[in-house]
Regions:
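Mid-length scaffold segments of soluble, non-membrane domains
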Residues: 75-150
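Bacterial N-terminal signal peptides
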Residues: 2-12
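A structured, mid-to-C-terminal "fold-capping" secondary-structure block
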Residues: 17-23, 135-249
Length: 249
């Protein structure tokens, strides 16, 4: 079901640039026909089932409660962040991430409160796909994995296994598992409602928009927000124009 969460929207980052790196090729999508079919399936399920439930949840659930729920699940996922910080050779960050997890798991009442940020232990976003990128693996073909992941790639797909194995929820059995998992899905989808609306209103082709936004956000994460300038074309650049430059502060 993670896909249905991500099918809605990966990220708005990067939509102000045109990627022309190296050969100038667009995102490799040799499986586009199958990917589009999977996207359509997820989008249909989302609109028919998950989105209405998430909208109701967002309306009736107080914001502080939703923040606490989000913090709780972010904290559970953070073991994956810690491991991949170390695997990428970010030792100082790995120690900070470990301390963040310990503080939020204890003083933060199981992660419901984000006390770590208040004391300067900032949240990071690392996963095995980023680790493979740091190790030199290319992204490979774009993949859309229905029901469990959503936008992905050949390089990012293995993170499904590693993030699952490192998530404590994986080892919960019995009647507790299903309601907790359902809460995670619904809360995550509710957090994406505004982004979904923007995507649907702005994109002529939501599939392509989702794909390009995902791939550009992955580049952003891999480079820790410091993207290389080579290979990116400034869409505002026009050497033949006499118009004054637009300055955004």
């Amino acid at each position: 079901m993670k896909l249905i969460l991500l099918v809605t929207f990966s990220s708005l980052y990067g939509c102000a640039t045109t990627h022309t790196a190296d050969t100038g090729a667009v995102t490799p999508d040799p499986f586009e026909r199958a990917n589009r079919s999977f996207y359509t399936l997820d989008d249909s399920l989302d609109k028919a089932i998950l989105k209405p439930i998430a909208e109701t949840y967002a309306e009736i659930t107080p914001t502080p409660v939703r923040i606490g729920v989000t913090n709780f699940f972010d904290n559970l996922y953070y073991l994956n962040v810690i491991v991949n910080s170390f695997l990428q050779g970010k030792l100082k960050q790995g120690v900070s991430d470990t301390a963040r997890f310990v503080f939020n798991s204890t003083l933060g009442i199981g992660g419901l409160l984000d006390v770590a940020t208040d004391i300067g232990l900032l949240m990071h976003d690392e996963d095995f796909g980023q680790t493979l990128a740091v190790w030199g693996f290319e992204s490979g073909a774009y993949l859309y994995i229905p029901l469990v992941e959503g936008p992905s790639s050949v390089r990012d797909a293995p993170d499904i296994a590693t993030s699952t194995l490192l998530n404590p929820l994986t080892y919960i059995t019995g009647v507790v598992l299903w309601p907790v998992s359902a809460l995670h899905i619904i809360n995550s989808r509710a957090n994406l409602l505004d982004d979904t609306t923007i995507r649907d209103e702005a994109a002529v082709d939501p599939y392509s928009f989702t794909r390009e936004a995902f791939m550009q956000r992955r580049e952003y994460l891999i480079h820790d927000g410091e993207l290389p300038t080579e290979g990116y074309e400034d869409i505002f650049e026009d050497d033949d124009s006499d118009s004054p430059a637009l300055i955004i502060e």
